[in-house]
A protein has these predicted regions:
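Conserved interdomain linker/interface between the two RecA-like ATPase lobes of SF2 helicase motors
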Residues: 303, 313-435, 481
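C-terminal or mid-to-C-terminal helical accessory/interaction module adjacent to the motor/catalytic core
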Residues: 555-638, 651
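C-terminal helical accessory/scaffold domains
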Residues: 599, 635-644, 648-853
Length: 932
């Protein structure tokens, strides 16, 4: 007892900050310490033998430089596997393709951005040059100089291979339009948030210090000078789900948007009669017109713009469409087709450890079929491959596809290049990345600088609130990363940047990376041609292959498609398939025309039957189906909208949107989703459960996110058991029966969706289950805990939170348009909590960068009780609290001092940003109080 008392007296009163300061750094080791099969492997690992890319001799990786070499003192894992050797088959030398000339060396000034024909201001040309664009290719110049394009008088549809410079043409046309017409705006539409964020950075860099051609009014007043300069500058804003921008249509010159946000912006501009300010619309990835989920929104946008007949230039581009002429005819545009690739790409097929040129794939399959029926010689004897991969003695590489993948990846790295590996699922990403990392060269052979960069990457990921993924921890130190939708945004960005900068040598990704992120590689390896269970389409395959070859770094690129026996015929057909023709998504089975007509009527674009017919004539649907059929579809859609009370027919035979129809359009819901939300909200008005928050979380659960949710019924039952009276009443009120949940647990059955009633019931239960995840997010439960509780990836939860922000805003706007002001006010308050990921008492602190949810609560509990306290804090005092954000990392083995120092450095940098952000917000609030 006395011993205990002495310990207490010596320590005194300790806060959690004091305890955190005393804790040693303890995290999982950098990689698993699996022992190699034999001691001989350690000697062989450093001298793998394989074929170098394009005959290039191997470049040895950096090694230590003597006794005085100061390298990080960390325990590094050794390679456990040895990649198989790649051998060239005698008599099949690789044909050398002629490389294209540098565009700046041909056709003189025509290919220079300084050419007066382009009419670009010197500041813009200088910014392009600073970004590495000093000249353009002949096809780009020919396209830009097409009649009426640079003056904005003609629309343009064009195609070019991935990496061929498509975006530059649209950038030049759009920027020229904005610079020369200071009162006009532009909208740039991209399909994915990652692409929007990437484009925002690029455009802001390009337009820095570039001014619009504004007329000088001669006002000598110096106080007006700054205002005039602001008016001349080009303002670029991003509009996408989960963005925190406060910019509006009036605050921007170029709006970089996702498809949904762009459609909403155009609807608002039409409704407010400000559409005349729009000067250009750029549609990147135009093949998305054909997407069954979002394509119809692109067609809606273009149709509305065509009907308006305003002076708006439409520019559409894609690498994977075949009916360019039809699309150009639809919008009365010039069209241009380029097949030029600045970096040539060689394509290969790998089957049964043999490498064949992709051009011989059909011959390969035909020969294999004959051998199967006749029992002839080995395939490699009948159709000699260009190269072969030796079978592996390692059990993990006994599968020829895995053996080929590892061999090709290691061969690329050993030659000094980067490899991008595509696979069919999230789980496969992690498994294959781990497999490749086991055969990578030992980190001990790296120089201090390269090893330091990898350790910095580990420290950066370790400092995130979600912590460092154990699977990534094992592969990153070996130079291998993976990238999929199950990861958080911060993880994906850090991994992508590290690969782009050469810190990581191999990146294993799902197929969606090819469309969503621009990460080229010297060699692209496609391990199987399936995405999940489905075979990828020709367009997706082209996009993956198009990532091969990095302009400015590589003079060539290569793609390798690894295929198994069961898929060989399908892959042969795939390699020979043409790009799919784009079709309209307004067809009856896709129900897109209902939304198209509702939006046009609600925004006042059309009303009478004659005007509606003119509107239908502007659709792609009208160009691709029989004219009578298109009008028949129109009549059916109008009748459905009227029956659903979204529109009504006036006595003068004109249509007008009802209050419900206006609310559906204003909130950016599809008609069917809007009707479901209406019924839910109408029921909530009768008895909204106000003594808890479960009812609000249910209402804010996005319909699309819930539709993709797989319910874990035992977890659902456990969650219901934890609810208080208020929560149970709220869920029972919306239609959740705890008894039904128990029966699903006992039976192990899945939800039936055979009838409309069953579909509605399934939607309710999925939304209720997803609402628990939103509740946890808003109640400051750490992301890893939520991920473990619901058995779903952290990235999925983060995506849910981002989707929820947009959906919640739509719900609030819906209530406002319906005149339900009190309900809108209640929901709007809870929307702030959702965005902050915290309870009401932390909303002010949650405005600060890096301070969200659990982090905000820890700061408050450890003395930083408000915004002012954060603003006045010493960053060093915040670091111990940041160490507590991810406690599971402090319960394992100690970090080596070198790693601990890097980790602490990352946390200190974040603490400094937190203090600076808090200061900025605090000063702004004080200024508002002074002004009042």
């Amino acid at each position: 007892m006395s011993a205990h008392r002495g310990a207490i007296q010596n320590s005194g009163f300790q806060t959690s900050v004091d305890i955190a300061r005393q804790q040693p750094f303890a995290v999982a080791p950098l990689a698993g310490q699996k022992r190699p099969p034999s001691g001989a492997l350690d000697e062989e690992t450093n001298n793998p033998s394989s074929h170098a890319i394009n005959g290039t001799s191997r470049q040895n990786l950096p090694t230590g430089q003597g006794l005085d070499f100061n390298r990080p003192q960390v325990h590094l894992p050794k390679s456990r596997l040895i990649a198989s050797e790649i051998c060239t088959v005698s008599g099949s030398e690789k044909e050398q393709k002629p490389r294209p000339d540098d565009p700046s060396k041909s056709q003189g000034s025509l290919q220079s951005l300084n050419d007066p024909r382009f009419g670009l201001p010197p500041a813009l040309v200088a910014n392009f040059a600073a970004a590495g664009v000093t000249s353009i290719y002949q096809w780009q110049a020919s396209c830009l100089l097409g009649e009426g394009l640079l003056k904005g008088k003609r629309h343009l549809i064009y195609t070019a291979p991935t990496g061929g410079g498509k975006s530059l043409v649209a950038d030049v046309l759009m920027l020229k339009r904005i610079i020369e017409n200071p009162t006009r705006k532009a909208i740039l539409v991209l399909p994915y948030v990652a692409l929007v964020q990437e484009k925002l950075k690029w455009l802001r860099r390009i337009v820095q210090d570039v001014e619009k051609f504004a007329v000088d009014d001669g006002d000598p007043d110096p106080s007006h000078h700054r205002w005039r300069r602001m008016q001349k500058s080009i303002r670029i804003s991003g509009f996408f789900g989960g963005s925190k921008t406060t910019a509006s249509w009036d605050d921007t010159d170029i709006a970089v948007c996702t498809i949904e946000k762009a459609n909403s912006l155009i609807n608002t501009a039409i409704e407010e009669c400000s559409i005349g300010e729009l000067g250009a619309v750029v549609l990147d990835e135009l093949h998305m017109l054909d997407d069954e989920h979002r394509g119809y929104l692109l067609e809606l946008m273009v149709t509305k713009l065509l009907l308006l007949q305003q002076d708006i230039q439409i520019i559409g581009m894609s690498a994977t469409i075949s009916n360019t002429e039809l699309l150009a005819d639809w919008i009365n545009a010039r069209y241009f087709v380029s097949t030029y690739r600045p970096v040539p790409v060689d394509e290969y097929l790998i089957y049964d450890n043999a490498i064949y040129p992709a051009a011989t794939s059909r011959q390969l399959f035909q020969t294999m079929s004959k051998l199967t029926t006749t029992g002839g010689p080995f395939l490699s004897e009948a159709v000699p491959p260009q190269r072969t991969i030796k079978p592996s003695a390692f059990r993990e590489l006994s599968n020829p596809m895995s053996n080929a993948m590892v061999a090709m990846a290691i061969d690329t790295v050993t030659a000094g290049y980067g490899a991008l590996v595509f696979c069919g699922s999230r789980v496969a990403c992690q498994v294959q990345a781990a497999l490749i990392s086991e055969a990578m060269p030992d980190p001990a052979t790296l120089g201090a600088e390269d090893l330091g960069k990898r350790l910095d990457l580990l420290a950066e990921l370790r400092s995130l609130p979600s912590g460092l993924d154990p699977a990534l921890e094992k592969t990153l130190i070996k130079g291998v990363g993976f990238h999929n939708a199950g990861m958080t945004t911060e993880e994906r960005e850090a991994i992508a940047q590290a690969y782009d900068q050469g810190v990581l040598k191999v990146l294993v990704a799902t197929c969606s990376l090819a469309a969503g992120v621009n990460l080229p590689a010297r060699r692209v390896i496609i391990n199987g041609a399936r995405m999940g269970r489905e075979l990828v389409g020709p367009a997706m395959l082209r996009q993956m292959c198009g990532r091969a070859g990095r302009k400015g770094k590589d003079e060539a690129g290569e793609t390798y498609l690894i295929v198994g026996k069961s898929d060989l015929q399908a892959v042969c057909d795939l390699l020979e398939a043409d790009m799919p023709a784009i079709e309209s998504c307004l067809a009856p089975e896709k129900r897109g025309l209902k939304r198209a007509l509702l939006e046009a009527i609600a925004t006042g674009l059309v009303s009478g039957v004659a005007a509606i017919k003119e509107y239908v004539k502007c659709t792609l649907l009208y160009r691709t189906v029989d004219k009578k059929l298109s009008y028949s579809i129109m009549d059916s859609a109008l009748q459905e909208l009227a029956e659903e009370k979204l529109i009504q027919l006036n006595e003068d035979e004109s249509y007008v949107a009802t209050q419900l129809g206006q609310a559906v359009v204003a909130s950016a819901f599809a008609p069917d989703d809007g009707l479901f939300v209406y019924e839910e909200l109408k029921r909530a008005l009768q008895a909204f459960v106000m003594d808890g928050d479960m009812h609000v979380f249910y209402m804010f659960t996005p319909l699309q996110a819930a539709a993709q949710t797989q319910i874990d019924w035992p977890t659902f039952r456990d969650l219901l058991d934890t609810l208080d009276d208020s929560g149970i009443r709220a869920l029972q009120f919306v239609g959740v029966n705890p008894g039904f949940v128990n029966s699903m647990v006992q039976s192990g059955a899945s939800l039936k969706e055979d009838t409309p009633e069953q579909v509605t019931q399934a939607r309710i239960y999925r939304r209720a289950y997803t609402a628990f995840q939103l509740r946890d997010l808003s109640n400051e439960v750490p992301l890893p805990v939520i991920s473990s509780r619901y058995k779903i990836p952290r990235g999925t939860i983060q995506t849910l939170a981002q989707q929820c922000h947009g959906f919640a805003a739509g719900i609030v706007k819906f209530c406002q348009r319906m005149g339900w002001g009190m309900l809108a006010a209640v929901l709007d308050h809870m929307r702030d909590r959702l965005e902050a990921g915290a309870r009401a008492d932390l909303l002010e602190m949650a405005q600060v960068t890096y301070v969200k949810g659990w982090t905000a609560r820890l700061l408050r509990d450890n003395g930083f009780r408000n915004l002012r306290a954060l603003a006045e804090a010493d960053p060093k005092d915040i670091v111990p609290v940041l160490k507590m954000v991810n406690p599971r990392k402090t319960q394992r083995n100690q970090l080596h001092p070198t790693e601990a120092e890097r980790y602490a450095g990352k946390l200190l940098a974040k603490a400094e940003i937190i203090v600076a952000s808090a200061n900025k917000i605090w000063e702004r609030e004080m200024q508002v109080e002074l002004d009042e």
